[in-house]
From Swiss-Prot:
Its main location: membrane. The keyword Zinc does not apply. The chain crosses the membrane at residues 3-23, 43-63, 73-93, 95-115, 135-155, 162-182, 216-236, 248-268, 280-300, 309-329, 346-366, 377-397. The lineage of its organism: Bacteria, Pseudomonadati, Pseudomonadota, Alphaproteobacteria, Rickettsiales. This is Uncharacterized transporter RBE_0856. GO terms for biological process: xenobiotic detoxification by transmembrane export across the plasma membrane. Gene3D superfamilies: Multidrug resistance protein D (1.20.1720.10). It holds the Pfam family MFS_1.
């Protein structure tokens, strides 16, 4: 595949992290939003499920458009939608309006994921692409945790409305900056018109490995974001932790993610360990972490422990999972679409839509399991982690059949 321009890694980072930081800042304010609109926590959490559905719709449509019209104009369009919907959210008179605005906000910000990944594949190939993903992934976890800290301070010292002020300003700044310096990386603009979109769609839908990769990404990100939408109610509401301190706790997950990312990069670049072995190691970390989380959550339901001990019992297992997350997911993204180089945007849009629908389903389940007990979501996470390991095992079987 020819390369016409390379998007700098820092610009990819901005695209990749815009949605995660938006969601983690927002989730810090879920208890406050629940109180403001005089509703229940389960209803408020559904705003996150709708966010991921809007994200899935954006990925499905905007990825296709980037194949036809180019990556750059679609990114600028998405950032514009993101900024406008954030402004609307500030003045939402009820929870239903906020739900709709969040859906539209997610549709716009989805360009950061689907177009960002397409631009990465346009710009880098092979082991260089793996290294770029592995190098960026620690920051993909650090910055969202920074979002929890920012959100915690905003909620503690002002109100949830100012989180959307932050989003609208961020979107406007990025839109202005990218209008000036964002390169066009798609070397096959209009290619998808001759390749026939529905023929590509048919191939993608029949690709078993792609569906399994989508399940793994959806499950792991569902665990990640599911924890973020449940954690504020556990720590701020139940344990009476200050919102700003809760934001600081989120950095524990960042440190684990950074370690996992650097470990993955080291194993690939310095030790020349095959990507598949790195992915298996990631699954091992995740299953162990989610198992411990389920055990600890069940213990906390039956026994009274100190606040500090309870925090450790909840965050330490999640840190193990996050190490595994950052060992596995970058490589999953690298391999899932390697056979779709000329239709990366189209294939990526279908792929991304699948796993974001799964993320929406997981967060919806978390909202439905939301109760006075904290063991429900932890058991769900364990099921998802083990199921992901089974899915990856089946991918290896399909890969071996492909070689023979």
């Amino acid at each position: 595949m020819k390369i016409i321009a390379k998007i700098p890694a820092w610009m990819l980072l901005c695209l990749f992290t815009l949605s995660p930081i938006t969601e983690t800042i927002y989730t810090s304010g879920l208890p406050s939003i629940t109180e403001y609109f005089n509703t229940d926590g389960s209803t408020t959490q559904i705003t996150s499920s709708l966010y991921y559905l809007g994200f899935a719709l954006g990925i499905l449509t905007l990825g296709r458009l980037s194949d036809i019209y180019g990556r750059r104009p679609v990114v600028l369009f998405g950032l514009c939608i993101y900024a406008i919907s954030s402004i609307i959210s500030i003045f939402a008179p009820n929870i239903e309006t906020l739900m709709l605005a969040r859906f539209v906000q997610a549709f716009g910000v989805s360009v950061g994921s689907v177009i960002g990944q397409a631009m990465a594949r346009d710009s880098y190939q092979g082991s260089e692409l793996s290294y770029v993903y592995a190098s960026l992934s620690p920051w993909l976890l650090f910055i969202p945790s920074l979002g929890s800290s920012i959100g915690g301070y905003i909620i503690e010292y002002s109100s949830w409305h100012y989180t959307f002020v932050f989003f609208s300003l961020t979107g406007t700044v990025l839109l202005t900056l990218y209008c000036k310096i964002l390169p066009e990386t798609n070397p096959y603009i209009n290619f998808s018109q001759t390749s026939k979109y529905f023929e590509v769609l048919k191939v993608v839908i029949r690709d078993k490995s792609l569906w399994l990769y989508a399940f793994i990404i959806g499950a792991f990100n569902g665990i990640y974001y599911g924890f973020y939408i449940e954690a504020p109610f556990i720590f701020i509401d139940k344990m009476k932790v200050a919102p700003s301190f809760y934001g600081k706790l989120a950095f524990l997950l960042s440190f684990a993610g950074i370690f996992g990312g650097f470990l993955g990069g080291y194993l690939i670049k310095k030790r020349h360990i095959h990507d598949q072995k790195v992915m298996i190691l990631g699954l091992v970390f995740s299953v162990i972490g989610c198992s411990l989380l389920a055990i600890d959550a069940l213990i906390l339901q039956d026994k009274e422990v100190g606040q500090n001990i309870a925090v450790i019992m909840m965050f330490a297992p999640m840190m193990l999972h996050m190490v595994g997350h950052n060992l596995l997911i970058p490589m999953t993204l690298r391999y899932a679409l390697e056979d779709y180089a000329k239709v990366t945007g189209t294939a990526g849009s279908v792929f991304g839509a699948i796993y974001y629908v799964l993320i929406a389903a997981v967060t919806f389940l978390v909202s439905k399991l939301h109760s006075d007990t904290i063991g429900n979501f932890a058991l769900l996470f364990l099921v998802l982690s083990v199921s992901s390991a089974a899915a990856f095992y089946y991918i290896l079987i399909l890969y071996k059949k492909k070689l023979t």
